[in-house]
């Protein structure tokens, strides 16, 4: 490719779901990239900013920029974190490095489709799969269409999954509904968050999904907790795990 590519691993993925980070790295390497992992990287600052501590998050944002300033592309398995870097670093002085990093950061599926032009993932996954696109990816990054705008196409993640051999993508009643997580929202409005999550899971189960997949592990973490408590017959997998052939 001839460009420097870095992997940005969200803090919750690093601590709770390292297999998603490994799958993302292996997937990018399968497509011929020499991917670097800057050891100085840390949280993008989204949790603090979402809690109302936006100015307190500036030091974290500056650290993020320093870690990734030398790269042409910064790829992450999280639409939510990518959205934060692209759209919520406005309080930083807009230096060349800040502007460069904000423009270089990509959600994984968007990078595969829009930059690498991946058409055939080259793997099989013979399961019934429900697709969940997180709100920041869907309505923030515009990586999938929204029903309130009369749009029905599935976006970049669904486009990739449709080319996976043996997969059956289930049609949901509410294909673009929020899972209810919302970071701090799941703490401050726990009952509402849990109800929204249960509705989301039940939509997938009702249509026979064996697996719920998403580009955001934060959404899947929320749904997985509900699935376990309710003993529901479905599991969650990050889209990187499917596209990498990690799970079959």
What residue ranges belong to the model's regions?
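Iron-sulfur cluster-binding electron-transfer modules in prokaryotic oxidoreductases
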Residues: 1-248
């Amino acid at each position: 490719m001839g460009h420097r590519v870095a992997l940005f691993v969200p803090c919750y993925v690093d601590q709770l779901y390292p297999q998603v980070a490994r799958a993302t790295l292996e997937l990018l390497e399968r497509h011929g990239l020499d991917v670097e992992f800057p050891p100085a990287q840390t949280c993008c600052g989204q949790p603090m900013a979402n809690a109302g501590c936006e100015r307190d998050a500036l030091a974290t944002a500056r650290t993020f920029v320093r870690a990734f300033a030398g790269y042409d592309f910064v790829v992450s398995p999280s639409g939510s974190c990518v959205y934060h870097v692209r759209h919520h670093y406005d309080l930083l002085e807009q230096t060349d490095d800040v502007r460069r990093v904000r423009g270089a950061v990509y959600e994984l599926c968007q990078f595969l489709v829009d930059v690498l032009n991946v058409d055939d993932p080259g793997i099989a996954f013979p399961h019934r799969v429900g697709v969940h696109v997180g709100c920041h990816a869907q309505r923030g990054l515009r990586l999938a269409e929204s029903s309130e705008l009369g749009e029905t196409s599935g976006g970049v993640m669904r486009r990739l999954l449709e080319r996976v051999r043996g997969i059956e993508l289930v049609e949901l009643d509410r294909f673009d509904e929020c899972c209810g997580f919302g970071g701090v929202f799941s703490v401050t409005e726990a009952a509402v968050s849990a109800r929204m999550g249960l509705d989301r899971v039940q939509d997938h189960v009702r249509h026979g999904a064996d697996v719920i997949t998403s580009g955001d592990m934060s959404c899947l973490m929320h749904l997985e907790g509900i699935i376990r408590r309710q003993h529901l017959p479905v599991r969650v997998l990050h889209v990187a795990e499917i596209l990498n052939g990690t799970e079959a």
